[in-house]
Curated annotation (Swiss-Prot):
Has two separate and distinct potassium-binding sites. One site is formed by three periplasmic loops and is inferred to be the site of initial binding. The other site is cytoplasmic. GO terms for molecular function: P-type potassium transmembrane transporter activity; potassium ion binding. Pfam families: KdpA (PF03814). The lineage of its organism: Bacteria, Pseudomonadati, Pseudomonadota, Gammaproteobacteria, Enterobacterales. The chain crosses the membrane at residues 3-27, 62-84, 126-149, 166-192, 250-269, 280-300, 357-368, 415-435, 480-501, 525-552. The system is composed of three essential subunits: KdpA, KdpB and KdpC. The complex also contains KdpF, a small non-essential subunit. The KdpFABC complex exists as a dimer above concentrations of 30-50 nM, whereas the complex exists as a functional monomer at lower concentrations. HAMAP family: KdpA (MF_00275). This is Potassium-transporting ATPase potassium-binding subunit. Residues 28-61, 150-165, 270-279, 369-414, 502-524 are cytoplasmic. Changing residue 232 to A/S: Decrease in K(+) affinity and loss of cation selectivity. It is a multi-pass membrane protein. NCBIfam families: kdpA (TIGR00680).
């Protein structure tokens, strides 16, 4: 079993790196504001037709463009969900959503979280799924990538005030990265057996003679960008464990690759743009070390079996509860870590049914800020915050003004870095405390004791860090939970983007300093260890008390 797990992890990472490297080169061209070959004429026509100016923006203008697009998308999606019964492509005549569920869902998909307090096949029409959710899957992913584009440019430019043009970046990211790759993935899913139709639900007779209603819909097209954009919201309630979404072991492997593809490619692009590929490899090493350790821990915990069943004298050699037998425990464990290391949230197994230790690792990966590969764009700019913090700590230890890639890291940058890092832990801890203090919060818990608290902590961690997965034992479709989680998702997304853009605006105005004998190298194993230690230290200090009340207490009981 250990050899199989090692081979699975090694194969996954090897294929991932091979695919991400050329994509990273394409992203590097876009960051450097160089159109991809053959796209210049199309871009010129589109920009003219849409009235888009290619004039560069400062950080405030860039931020306002990103926020404006997302707020407009939020309003449109909210009213679309409220009135979906008036809109076309609704063969099941599904009614509009309640205001609180519509708000929660709109915020969820605009912020790239894709938390779902509903069952897709019984709640949303085809039009809502396509024109509402799928569109936001593209736009939210493009927004995250655009933000990291701006931050990377802040390190490459000197004594400037501009970071690029948000509209140009968003169009290029969507047209030349997200749409083509998602189209290829969708066609592959269709070839493998994923649904893509507009038929009404089909009544069929089962082998036992009973009747069953099979849901239909344009699944493959949404499934592709759901994974590629690290969105995670499933067309069906069972998400990627549903055979209509994820029909074969091969599609399952491609889905995991799609989740990590752009975050990995962005690391390669970062090194290429900086003119020092070692900088990108340093980030990949730090992310990969944490990732491999976490996968190993979850695999080990799930292979040990369910201790509660063992205590009852029942055979439980491996913990298969809540897992698809066609994927097995090792693949389910790998998928769980992939989807929570990235801000995806798609699942092929029920995380609520994992062992205490096996469920704690995905929760902790979210709590440290989704920086282990992370979401498209958001993962890299989240890790860059920890890089700045690590550089600052190193500067304190050696008594020098910290600098990174030639840019001095001053008080302003560190205040903004601390603010961005503290946003999500504050939301998680205060949100969980509020839920446990109120009847409306506690009434959603279906399990008592430490596991019930783990369900609450997981939900708030997932929302605040824009992941979207859940311990499904929590009944979260109520006004209290819909509003609480919507607030956490909104602030957790934009409360980090705003200080990140402010950091970019501050750095782009500075001159680059030549490296000296006292400059800390940020590309070697020493800095990789320092960066990993910084991530672990912040995560440990912040969340160990809360984790001790939930999964740790459950593990020890």
């Amino acid at each position: 079993m250990a050899a199989q797990g090692f081979l699975l992890i090694a194969t996954f990472l090897l294929v991932l790196m091979v695919l991400a490297r050329p994509l990273g080169s394409g992203l590097a061209r876009l960051i450097n504001d160089i159109p991809l070959p053959g796209t210049t004429g199309v871009e010129r026509v589109l920009f003219r037709a849409l009235g888009v100016s290619d004039r560069e923006m400062n950080w405030k203008q860039y931020l306002c463009a990103i926020l404006g697009l997302n707020m407009l998308g939020l309003a449109v999606l909210f009213f679309m969900l409220l009135g979906q019964h008036y809109l076309p492509l609704n063969p099941q005549q599904l009614p509009g959503l309640s205001w609180d569920l519509a708000l929660n869902t709109a915020v969820s998909f605009v912020t790239n979280t894709n938390w779902q307090s509903y069952s897709g096949e019984t709640t949303l029409s085809y039009f809502s799924q396509m024109a509402g959710l799928t569109v936001q899957n593209f736009l939210s992913a493009a927004s995250g990538i655009a933000v990291i584009f701006a931050l990377i440019r802040a390190f490459t430019r000197q004594s400037m005030s501009t970071l690029g043009n948000a509209w140009v970046d968003l169009l290029r990211i969507t047209l030349w990265v997200l749409v083509p790759v998602a189209l290829l993935i969708a066609l592959f899913f269709i070839q493998q057996g994923a649904l893509q139709n507009f038929l009404p639900y089909q009544a069929v007779n089962t082998v036992e003679g009973a009747q069953q209603l099979l849901p239909m819909g344009p699944v493959a097209s949404q499934e592709a960008i759901k994974m590629l954009g690290t969105n995670g919201g499933g067309f069906f309630n069972a998400n990627s464990s549903h055979p209509f979404e994820n029909p074969t072991a091969l599609t399952n492997f491609v889905q995991m690759l799609a989740i990590f593809l752009i975050p990995t490619a962005l690391c390669f692009a970062f090194g290429e743009v900086m003119g020092d590929r070692r900088q990108g490899r340093m980030l990949l090493w730090a992310m990969s070390v944490i990732f491999v350790i976490c996968v190993g821990v979850v695999m080990w915990a799930e292979v040990q079996g369910n201790p509660h069943l063992l205590a009852l004298g029942t055979d439980s050699s491996i913990n298969m509860e809540g897992k698809e037998s066609r994927f097995g425990v090792l693949v389910s464990s790998l998928f769980a870590v992939v989807t929570t290391a990235a801000s995806c949230g798609a699942v092929i197994a029920m995380h609520d049914s994992f062992t205490a230790l096996g469920g704690m690792v995905p929760m902790w990966l979210m709590q440290i800020g989704e920086v282990v590969f992370g979401g498209v764009g958001s993962g890299l700019y989240g890790m860059m915050l920890f890089v700045l913090l690590a550089v600052f700590i190193a500067g304190l230890m050696i008594g020098r003004t910290p600098e990174y890639l030639g840019k001095k890291i001053d008080v302003r940058e560190m205040k903004l870095t601390a603010l961005a890092i503290l946003v999500t832990p504050t939301l998680v801890l205060m949100g969980a405390a509020l839920a446990m203090m109120t009847d409306a919060g506690r009434s959603a818990m279906l399990n008592p004791g430490p596991h019930g608290f783990s369900e609450v902590l997981y939900a708030v961690s997932s929302a605040a860090n824009n992941n979207g997965s859940a311990f499904a034992g929590l009944s979260a479709n109520s006004p209290f939970w819909n509003c609480l989680l919507a607030f956490c998702m909104f602030v957790g997304r934009f409360g980090v983007i705003i200080p990140v853009m402010a950091i970019a605006g501050s750095l782009v105005s500075k001159k680059s300093q030549a490296a000296s004998s006292g400059t800390l190298p940020t590309h070697g194993p020493l800095f990789v260890g320092l960066l990993i230690g910084t991530v672990l230290l912040v995560g440990a200090l912040t969340f160990i008390p809360a984790l001790a009340l939930g999964p740790v207490a459950e593990y020890l009981s």
